[in-house]
Amino acid sequence: VGAPDMRNKLMTEGKLVTYGIYFDVNKDVVKPESYGTLKEIAAILNEVPDVQVKIVGHTDSDGADAANLDLSKRRAASVKNELVKSFGVNGDRLVTDGMGESQPVAPNDTPANKALNRRVEFIKL
């Protein structure tokens, strides 16, 4: 249940970074093509019901800092809502936060690098 590598990253390493959760530009609605990734994460969470997780949204540097911070928080909340509503994860186990553009994993100098910075992280609490 759940991809073994994803399960290992979250449960053993304590952090799972995902790039398979998609949103339209400046929007916080989870796109349908994200459901495969969400389904795998939900399977892991439902398999280990006592684990609590923080969902953290990140953006690239396009746009104003404050707008990106707000957007990242709204996106993390949307991911939580989808996990609860569509995949039966207990929402009491999930907290959300957003970092905006403050923690890039790559320079924001190319479209490919910006895509790396647009991510959702799941952190075991």
Language model region names:
Residues 29-35, 48, 56-125:
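Periplasmic OmpA-like peptidoglycan-binding domain that tethers envelope proteins to the cell wall
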